[in-house]
């Protein structure tokens, strides 16, 4: 069953995961859940986007992907468990610094599968997708926030400070010899 898949997280990991998911499963309804309307508006290739506190009544998903991480992981996972159909799968990709409580009663009641993934094979598949669909790079360029030429430690410090102060996007350091 792959009628509808939800991805929680409107940051960089959620965006990258959603781009790849769209190319791997173009016929599956892709729904993005997040907390920032501006970030959600960048998911132009998704079928639907929803703020996590404004989910339509009766919305269900077949499978879920967690890309939230941090303190918000628990709320995201709880929401996934509530919306997912029985025997669905939840993939945990976001990193939390702390242990995250999970409602095992509902996991068991619904017969859900939970797994985490950061395996090398996943990254090998990523390279294959780049080769098959070069237009993916166009979508990924949307998350490049800044490019900084680096020749010194001061330049590196500047790049890291720029990166910390951005809401979205990655800073690329171009190393000069």
Regions found by a protein language model. Give the residues of each.
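Mid-domain Rossmann-like dinucleotide-binding core that forms the NAD(H)/NADP(H) cofactor-binding site
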Residues: 1-54
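N-terminal Rossmann-like NAD(P) cofactor-binding module of classical short-chain dehydrogenase/reductase
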Residues: 65, 91
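C-terminal hydrophobic helical "lid"/dimerization subdomain
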Residues: 78, 121-177
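Helix-to-beta-strand junctions that scaffold the AdoMet/dcAdoMet cofactor pocket
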Residues: 83-86
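Rossmann-fold NAD(P)-binding glycine/threonine-rich loop
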Residues: 93-112, 125-129
């Amino acid at each position: 069953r792959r009628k509808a898949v939800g991805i929680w997280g409107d940051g960089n990991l959620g965006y990258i995961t959603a781009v790849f998911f769209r190319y791997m499963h173009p016929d599956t309804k892709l729904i993005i859940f997040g907390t920032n309307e501006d970030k959600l508006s960048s998911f132009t290739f998704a079928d639907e986007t929803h703020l996590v506190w404004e989910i339509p009544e009766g919305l269900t998903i077949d499978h879920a992907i967690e890309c939230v991480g941090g303190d918000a992981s628990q709320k995201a996972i709880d929401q996934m468990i509530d919306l997912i159909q029985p025997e669905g799968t939840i993939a945990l990709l976001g990193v939390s610094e702390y242990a995250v409580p999970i409602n095992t009663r509902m996991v068991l009641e619904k017969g859900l599968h939970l797994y985490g993934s950061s395996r090398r094979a996943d990254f090998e598949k990523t390279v294959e997708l780049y080769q098959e669909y070069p237009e993916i790079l166009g979508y990924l360029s949307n998350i490049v926030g800044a490019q900084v030429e680096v020749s010194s430690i001061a330049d590196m410090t500047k790049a890291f400070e720029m990166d910390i102060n951005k809401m979205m996007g990655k800073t690329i350091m171009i190393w000069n010899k």
